[in-house]
Amino acid sequence: MAAKEVLFGNDARVKMLAGVNILANAVKVTLGPKGRNVVLDKSFGAPLITKDGVSVAKEIELEDKFENMGAQMVKEVASKANDAAGDGTTTATVLAQAIVTEGLKAVAAGMNPMDLKRGIDKAVVAAVAELKNLSQECSDTKAIAQVGTISANSDESIGEIIATAMERVGKEGVITVEEGQALENELDVVEGMQFDRGYLSPYFINKPETGSVELESPFILLVDKKVSNIRELLPILEGLAKTGKPLLIVAEDVEGEALATLVVNNMRGIVKVAAVKAPGFGDRRKAMLQDIAILTGGTVIAEEIGLELEKATLEDLGTAKRVIITKDDTTIIDGNGEETQIKARVAQIKIQAEESTSDYDKEKLQERMAKLAGGVAVIKVGAATEVEMKEKKARVEDALHATRAAVEEGVVAGGGVALVRVASKIGELDVINEDQKHGVIIALRAMEAPLRQIAANAGEEGSVVANNVKNGTGNYGYNAGNDTYGDMLEMGILDPTKVTRSALQFASSIAGLMITTECMVAEVKEDAADMGGMGGMGGMGGMGGMM
């Protein structure tokens, strides 16, 4: 076991604070509309230019082990805020630095660290409750666009494209961000349910100009097994021929004689039919077949629940307004399922997603939910160079997370104003001694830090701006974008309540732990000089005759 170096008391806290400051100072230059960029060196490819707090924090690793421990703990603040709300990482870092700095000063002055932490915790609990009171619902497209714009560093085009995407696919819909090919941002919306399985035979194509199959008002047969015997399909096909409507078969697979007969019937015009494989594998395939059944008002023919394909009737089939099949995917538009059943299925999947511990499973469940709820939107980010593309894509992703958070928990005045108002509204809290009271004061003072930093990044004096804002009431605040004061909501400067709340809670939690640190343990760094015992390798020169 390697030897350890141990630091106690003030020596440990000074080192830890140095690490906190290095990381926080690198992150906080990005805060606000006039925040600067940070350039991150990459071992391969072009450097990454970013204004995303968590991206900067993740890159920082310090040489001094004790300083690095402080930096890593603040990195955890940014990371947790990012996981919870997807934004607010820089705000969380600024809050953590402010609480740690003031807290360690108080500890050095002889105050009890545990009482300070209890005071900070009480102030934060009161602040979170007050934030909920200040919060306003965010449901209209204009407010969603404003939240996205602020989060994307005042880029209105990003805010608007996110608001449009949400309007098109609904609040539960899936919105993904991809790198585009053009200079401008583009929005692609796939309405209806789409899954990545194409036609099983090109002979099903009835739109040669697009290379696709289009079925108008088709019946949809859902089978949870391989179909290879045409006799199993005959009762359905005979019933279908009388109606004159087309048929889509979604099965584990359709092969051999069954596929050949379907192709021949389709080409002769006896029955208009197309077949695709069911999406997913194993249990996920069963679940997705059930999703399609609920969406289209059909029944999944599965032997495990006692249903046989030969005995299926037209009543077991689902229906939709339209189906489009390409070689890669199938889209079912306007399924005729019952609205109440679709909503119940979405609610059921939502509960599964919330309870899931796997990120992959969560993502797949959310995709299923979106396909049932209305569709999928893809924002294709446009830029002139790859470096700009990466920076812009990160901003779009942040803005998307922020708008989702705003829809979930509402919005408060942006620009750090909400925390200043919250701090001013918290009155006397139930504390048992002076040290706890000082802990409350530390937390309330720290709540001004984001506003001060936004002002400082805009070239203003933070204290002057903070005093001006404190003298105002309600949503009155400082717009760093154009250096004016006014009503933040009217100016469209909004922050999601969830983002502000998460930043405050995570910052106070980890900062409180750092204040109560009394001892730090790290491995002793071995000098390169101590590694000099490897010099005896020089006797390999006689290997030349091996050629």
Curated annotation (Swiss-Prot):
Can you name a GO cellular component term? cytoplasm
- Residues involved in ATP binding: 30-33, 51, 87-91, 415, 495
Instruction: List, alphabetically, the PROSITE patterns matched.
Output: CHAPERONINS_CPN60
Catalytic reaction annotation: ATP + H2O + a folded polypeptide = ADP + phosphate + an unfolded polypeptide
Which EC numbers characterise this protein's activity in its record? 5.6.1.7
Pfam families given in the database record: Cpn60_TCP1
Q: What is its main location?
A: cytoplasm
Tell me the keywords, alphabetical order: ATP-binding, Chaperone, Cytoplasm, Isomerase, Nucleotide-binding
Where would you find this protein in the cell? Cytoplasm
One GO biological process term: protein refolding
* Molecular function in Gene Ontology: ATP binding; ATP-dependent protein folding chaperone; isomerase activity; unfolded protein binding
The answer, when asked if Secreted is one of the entry's keywords, is: no
Q: Does the keyword ATP-binding apply?
A: yes
PANTHER family per the UniProt record, alphabetical:
60 KDA HEAT SHOCK PROTEIN, MITOCHONDRIAL
How does this polypeptide assemble, per the annotation? Forms a cylinder of 14 subunits composed of two heptameric rings stacked back-to-back. Interacts with the co-chaperonin GroES.
**Annotated function:** Together with its co-chaperonin GroES, plays an essential role in assisting protein folding. The GroEL-GroES system forms a nano-cage that allows encapsulation of the non-native substrate proteins and provides a physical environment optimized to promote and accelerate protein folding.
Concerning its family, UniProt says:
Belongs to the chaperonin (HSP60) family.
NCBIfam families cross-referenced by the UniProt entry: GroEL, PRK00013.1, PRK12849.1, PRK12850.1, PRK12851.1
Question: Which protein is depicted?
Answer: Chaperonin GroEL
What organism does this protein naturally occur in? Shewanella pealeana (strain ATCC 700345 / ANG-SQ1)
